[in-house]
Amino acid sequence: MKAQTNKIAFLIALSMIVSTLNLSAQINTDYIGAGNNAGITITSSSEYGNTKAENTMNATGMDADRIEMSRFLSQATFGADMAEIQRATRIGMEAWIEEQVNMPINYLTPLHWDIWNEIETRWAMSFDVWLANYINELCLASHEDPTIDPPNLTQAEVDELQNAYMQELFGPFALQFNFAWSHSMMSNDDQLRQRVAYALSQILVISAQSDLGDNGESLSSYYDILLHHSFGNFRDLLLEVSLSTSMGIYLSHFNNPKAIPSENIQPDENYAREVMQLFSIGLFELNPDGTRKKDADGFDIPTYNNDDVKELARVFTGLGPGSTDPTMSHITWDAFFGLSYYSVNKTEPMIMYQEWHDVESKSLLNGLEIPAGQDGMTDIEMAIDYLFNHPNVGPFIGRQLIQRLIKSNPSPAYIERITEVFNDNGRGERGDMEAVIKAILMDPEARTCEELQEFDNGRLREPLLRGAEYLRVMPKIGEQILFDVTFNNYSCNGIEYTSDTIIVTDNLRFWNDGFNFFDAVKQFPLLSPSVFNFYLPNHQPVGEMAENNLFGPEFKIHDSSSAVNYINILYIFTAPFYDAAWYNWYQGLGLENIMFDYDDLTAIYVDDPEKFLHLSLIHI
């Protein structure tokens, strides 16, 4: 049986390597076979098991519709198992999208706090285990060195140790966000929203590789903005991102004062630059199909200049903390402009402190005139409205969403069709994200297989998506270690200590620490090295792709190191002699490690290898 399990692991690993590319079969029923076999009798000189001659015509094994649905779900989710593929095939793609749009939103912040509260509780409960190990270490030291007295701790000494132990727990920080994101991705059914939010997180970027990393709630609350607006309006998304305390810290318009020349203080220009360059209109004026406009001399036309950045920076002055951190009981004062980030409520948006806002008139972007004397929030909303209505937004954001969901090199016609939907959803509304996402997924260029073999089609699936799909579709169990400690006294002979390992199958906690995956393949949500994401949309790998003017963003993090490391991760995932697919940091607190359960797949393989291969091809 072990040899069969190893063979299954090898086949699964092989299918995961092949799954880097999105392949499918063209659905076509206009031919003999696939069930079009009325009046035809097929005979064969030899038949065995399921390989009956009549199956060559009667549609047995014809999975084109399910393979196409599997391809669709690989674009729209983090991974779908056979049951979901079959269900989605029955109801159809458009009905599936509608179903997804109407699902309740699974926000990360409540889950983040639930996780932290459980860790705090289990940390306190685990003190006895820590104390038993501590006393055993003292006993071992005294045994090895006769000059060291064996321990016999007093209750006062134990209480002091317990107080110190409780102080060692740090958080919540980025680790708890990683736990919450992983568990939500693995557990929740609102997969399209989860996938779109992940795409948006690579466009409207913040990163835990900053001060935000010390505050998990700042990451989860920001991600909730992306979840909330995934099917909303892009204008509302852009405004809420601009007011996010997390974004304010990351791109430094939090506590951004108006100019004070006598103190040589000028408004910070960071967010003003990036909200144009990366979050809305890009660097150059675009046609609706995403190609660059040219001036009379044939040069690209910039969308803004340095004066525009300076003027827009004045707009984003005066934003500060909305309230103080409710988890810090020692804070008894109200929030104020200039309050340290560490003392503020990271889950609330910034508010305007009018006395710190530049109230003079602003003129920018060849047409936006903001009059003097206005409230600061009015200035900001005018600027956001102007950016939102800029003709670049549709092709600039639409192309990147296509890249994140469908393909790296969408045709100009594809981009233009998405731009048209962004500009008008058919009901006179601009920026309708639900309509845009549906149009991207259902566009003929996304659904047809006719051009799959063309050199400019497809995309390199990033390592996070490849790994997530495998983690979601494979059957899983948990390995949990339970400890029982009794103290008769606090000496070498006073401890009764037992542990037991059990397997759990229900209510698994998919708490992936994320950092190990990031270290291996250079990617995990909200861990990009800069505001420019893990890769730029216009990245061109050196060689044939660059020579053919093709883009391959994901190739930026695909090198000899990450490629080998990803194979190593697959090996750990699939090798049956490893204890876990991933480790959380808290197994010592009684939290389970996640393992794959190959028993059912092994039984299928033993009974019918052909069916097993069929399952693996549909899944991955």
Task: Indicate where each model-derived feature is located.
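N-terminal accessory alpha/beta regions
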Residues: 80-227
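Structural motif
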Residues: 59-67, 172, 187-194, 266, ...
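Bacterial N-terminal signal peptides
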Residues: 11-20
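N-terminal mature-domain "stem" immediately C-terminal to a signal peptide or N-terminal signal-anchor/transmembrane
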Residues: 32-106
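Bacterial N-terminal signal peptides that target proteins for export
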Residues: 2-10
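Boundary at the C-terminal end of the N-terminal hydrophobic targeting segment
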Residues: 23-25
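Active-site substrate-binding loop specific to GH73 endo-beta-N-acetylglucosaminidase modules
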Residues: 39, 44-48, 89, 135, ...
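Flexible, low-complexity segments enriched for small/polar residues
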Residues: 45-46, 51, 70-77, 204, ...
